[in-house]
Amino acid sequence: MGRGAGREYSPAATTAENGGGKKKQKEKELDELKKEVAMDDHKLSLDELGRKYQVDLSKGLTNQRAQDVLARDGPNALTPPPTTPEWVKFCRQLFGGFSILLWIGAILCFLAYGIQAAMEDEPSNDNLYLGVVLAAVVIVTGCFSYYQEAKSSKIMDSFKNMVPQQALVIREGEKMQINAEEVVVGDLVEVKGGDRVPADLRIISSHGCKVDNSSLTGESEPQTRSPEFTHENPLETRNICFFSTNCVEGTARGIVIATGDRTVMGRIATLASGLEVGRTPIAMEIEHFIQLITGVAVFLGVSFFVLSLILGYSWLEAVIFLIGIIVANVPEGLLATVTVCLTLTAKRMARKNCLVKNLEAVETLGSTSTICSDKTGTLTQNRMTVAHMWFDNQIHEADTTEDQSGATFDKRSPTWTALSRIAGLCNRAVFKAGQENISVSKRDTAGDASESALLKCIELSCGSVRKMRDRNPKVAEIPFNSTNKYQLSIHEREDSPQSHVLVMKGAPERILDRCSTILVQGKEIPLDKEMQDAFQNAYMELGGLGERVLGFCQLNLPSGKFPRGFKFDTDELNFPTEKLCFVGLMSMIDPPRAAVPDAVGKCRSAGIKVIMVTGDHPITAKAIAKGVGIISEGNETVEDIAARLNIPMSQVNPREAKACVVHGSDLKDMTSEQLDEILKNHTEIVFARTSPQQKLIIVEGCQRQGAIVAVTGDGVNDSPALKKADIGIAMGISGSDVSKQAADMILLDDNFASIVTGVEEGRLIFDNLKKSIAYTLTSNIPEITPFLLFIIANIPLPLGTVTILCIDLGTDMVPAISLAYEAAESDIMKRQPRNSQTDKLVNERLISMAYGQIGMIQALGGFFTYFVILAENGFLPSRLLGIRLDWDDRTMNDLEDSYGQEWTYEQRKVVEFTCHTAFFASIVVVQWADLIICKTRRNSVFQQGMKNKILIFGLLEETALAAFLSYCPGMGVALRMYPLKVTWWFCAFPYSLLIFIYDEVRKLILRRYPGGWVEKETYY
C-alpha cells in the first residue's frame, strides 16, 4: 500500500514527472488507491468461492488452516497511521519557525561575550545574561506549545473506543466467539443486528439483513444484504458487507474475503495516512515574517558594521556592534505572544464546540475561501422526520411540535385515522426502553430511519403506538424486500371481534398498482383516471422536494373467510394482496439543522463559497441545498433553465446557470480541466452520489484554483479528503475514529454553524496577531536607535541590554497578549477571505508603520528624556558628542561637564544607568499610546471603545512593573536600574499624545477615502 504522495493529483502529472523513481512509485500507488475498489468476489458462485478460499461453506475453516492464514496475513486490524514520536514533536516546538531566530540570537550573544572575555580584563556580563535569557525563553515557550498540543491529542485518544471487538465464527462446524483481530480470510462469520461487521464479507445466506453503510458511502438509509449479485460495482452490490460498518437488523452468514488494511475501509484509511499534508498558512506567514525581520536586522547590522570600521573602531568592537544590533532586532517576547494568542483562541473555540487539534489550524480556518461540506448530519439533523402527507386529495404539512399546536388539518378525518393506523401497525420500529420522560422527537429508537420517523410522527399525533399495537395484535407479516418493494402485516381488529385488517406500505407506484379503490373522507371510491392523476401530481411534488415518499393501503378481510385463529401463510400466500384500498402518502426528509441557513448566509457575505458534497440522491441534495441557502433563491441550474424555457439541456449555455448539481457518475468521466471549468464558472455547486475518492478529487480541484479549502466529514469515507484539505473538520458525535484522526479540528456538536464561529475566530486571531506584532515591533526602534547613536555620535550609551530585556520580556508581554482578547472590528465577516499571496501577516506596510513612523516618534521621546536628565546633571548635548571614549575609561576620574564640575567613573556610571532607567520608562509611556492605537486597524478607537478588560490590566501592569523596577531597593545592584524623579516620567507624555493623534487622523483618512493613497501606504 502506498504511503506518501505528490502534492498535486492529476493523471498528467505522473507521466510528466521525471524525478526519482521512488516518488513516482508512491504517486502511482496513491493514484491506484484513488481509483474505485476492484474485486470480483461478488461475481463468483458459492462453489467457486469455497474453492478460492479452501473453505467448507457449512463447517467453516479448520483450526489449523485458520492459524496458518493468521500467521500469513497478520491480525485483522488497521495499521495505525504513522505517528510522530513525542521527542520529534518536542524538537519541532523547540527549533521550528520562530525559535530558530532566538537560538541564533542566543548563540551570537555567547559569541560576543566570548570575544569580550578574551579581550578585556573585566568584561561586562550583559551579553552572557542576554544569551541565557534568550535560550530560556525558547525552552519555556517550546514546552508550553508542546503541552498544549499534547493536551488536545489526549482528548483525541479518549475518543478511541478501547473495547476489543468480538466476532462469531464457525470453525470445524462449531460456533465460537473470538476477538475480531483473529478473524482470517476464508472464515465463516455470522453477524446479527447490532454487530459491527468484523471484516469484508461475501454474504452466502441472510434473513432480513440490513447494514448501515453511512460511514463508508454516506447513504443514510440502511442497505439490504443478501447472497444475490446485483451490481458490477462492489460498493453497490448486495452480497458484500464491509469491515466496520454496522448491521442494523436481521442476520447473515458470510465468508471473509479481506481483512485489515486490505479491506475497503483499510484502503481508505491507508489513502488518508499516505497523503502528504501541506504546511499551514500561519506557519508560512511566520516564516515570511522571520525572513523580513532577519533581513532588516542583517541589513542594519552590516551597514553599521561597515560604518563603525569607517569611523575608526577596531575589528573586534565592530563585530560586537554587529552582533548587538542583530540581537536588538530580535523581538524576544514575540514567540511567547504568538503561542499564547493561538492557545487562547483554541480555548475560546473549544467553549464554542470546536476542538482544535493543532494550534496553527486555528488561523487556517480564518483564511478559508471554500468549504466543502457533507450533507447528512452536518447540514441536516441526521434524523428522518415526516414532513408531508397526502390524503383526501390534499397535501398537508406534518405537525412536528411536541404539543401538536401546529396542526394543519382536521385530526378527526376518518382517512387520517386509517392512515395513522397503517403507519403505526405496519411498522417494526420501537422506542428503546426507559425514555418515557424524554420528548418524543429526542427519543432513541430501534429500527430503520424511515420507520422511526413514522413511529415518532404517529406517537406525537395519536398517542402511544405501543398501546395501538397491543389493541391490534399482529398475526402475520411479510418484511420489506427489494423485489416486491412493500411491507405487509395482518392484525386482529380492535373494532370488530371477529375480523382482521391487512395493512401495507411501500414504494408509492407499487402500492397504487395493487389498489382498485381509494379512501376519500372515509368512503371507498373507485380509483379512476382522475384520482390516479391527482396521486401522480402529489407524488411528483413531494419527490421534487427531495423527500422520501411512501404509499399506504389497507384491506378489511371478510370475517367469514378469515375468522380469528386463521393460519395466514406468508410463503404460499393464502390471502389477497390485490384490489386493496389506497389511503394516502407520507413523505419524510432529513431536515436541515436550524442554525445552518443563517450560517451559510454569513459564509456568503464573508466571501466563502460553500459546496455540498454528498453520497445522497441529486434531488434530495438539491432540495436540502435550496433549503439551507447553498443554492440561493432565484438561482437556477441548467436543468431549471431548460425546464423553464422548454428547450433541451444541450441548448442552454452552462455559463448562464449560477448553480450546478453534479452527479458522481458524470464526475467519474471528467478530466481535471472540465472539473476546473465547473468550479470556476458556477458560484453554487452541489456534488451528489459521490464516492470517497471523488471527494478527494474535488478538494484537489478547489486547491488548484488557489482556494484554501475546509472540508467537513464524519465517515471513514471522508478521511482522505479531510487529510488533503487545508483544514479538515470532523464530527465529534457521529464521526468515526478514522475521520477524527485525519482532521485538524473536531466539531463537538456536529453543527455546521460552529464552523462559521470558527471562521470568525480564525479571522480575528489573524487580525489580533497582526496588532500584537505591530505593537511588539514598534518598540524595536527606540531600542536600536540608542545603540546606533552610541556608535555614530560617540555619546554615552542611552539604553542598556538589560533594560531592553526588561521591555521585551517584561513590560511589553502582557499588553501584547491582551490584544489577543480584542473584540472583532465591524467589518470582520464582511471582508473577502484573505489572499495568502498578497495579504501577509507582516507586510512591508506594517514594518513601515511600526519602524518608520510610530517607532521614530517613540525614539524621539526616549532621547528627549535622556538629554533632559544629562543636562540637569550638567552635561549639555553639545558636550556629549564624542565624549564616549573618555566616559567609558575606568582610569579617568576627573571628567569635566559643561559647567566645569569634575566626575569620577563611578559617579558617571550612576548617571548613565539612571538614563537607561528613564529611557526605559519613556518607552513604557509611549507604548501606552501604541497599545491603544493597535486596538484597531481601520475603526477609530472611540468606535471600538475600551471594553477589553485584559488590555486595561495590561496598561496598569506595564506601568506598575516599570515603577517597581525603578524604585525597588536593591535594583541598582541587581539590574543597575535607579530611582527616577517624578518629573522625568512626564518627558515622554507629549510624544505619547502625538502618536495617538497622528494615528487617529490616519484612520479617519482611511475610512473617508477607502482605496486611496493613505490606505495603499499605511493600512497593514
UniProtKB/Swiss-Prot annotation:
The active site is at 374 (4-aspartylphosphate intermediate). The chain crosses the membrane at residues 86-106, 130-150, 287-306, 319-336, 770-789, 800-820, 841-863, 916-935, 949-967, 983-1003. Keywords: ATP-binding, Cell membrane, Disease variant, Epilepsy, Intellectual disability, Ion transport, Magnesium, Membrane, Metal-binding, Nucleotide-binding, Phosphoprotein, Potassium, Potassium transport, Sodium, Sodium transport, Sodium/potassium transport, Translocase, Transmembrane, Transmembrane helix, Transport. PROSITE patterns: ATPASE_E1_E2 (PS00154). Changing residue 887 to R: In FHM2; loss of function. Changing residue 715 to R: In FHM2; de novo mutation in a sporadic case. Residues 1-31, 212-231 are annotated as: Disordered. Changing residue 764 to P: In FHM2; loss of function. It is a multi-pass membrane protein. CDD domains: P-type_ATPase_Na-K_like. GO terms for molecular function: ATP binding; ATP hydrolysis activity; ATPase-coupled monoatomic cation transmembrane transporter activity; P-type sodium:potassium-exchanging transporter activity; phosphatase activity; potassium ion binding; protein heterodimerization activity; protein-folding chaperone binding. GO terms for biological process: adult locomotory behavior; amygdala development; ATP metabolic process; behavioral fear response; cardiac muscle contraction; cell communication by electrical coupling involved in cardiac conduction; cellular response to mechanical stimulus; cellular response to steroid hormone stimulus. Changing residue 1007 to W: In FHM2; some patients exhibit a clinical overlap between migraine and epilepsy. SMART domains: Cation_ATPase_N. It catalyses: K(+)(out) + Na(+)(in) + ATP + H2O = K(+)(in) + Na(+)(out) + ADP + phosphate + H(+). This is Sodium/potassium-transporting ATPase subunit alpha-2. It comes from Homo sapiens.
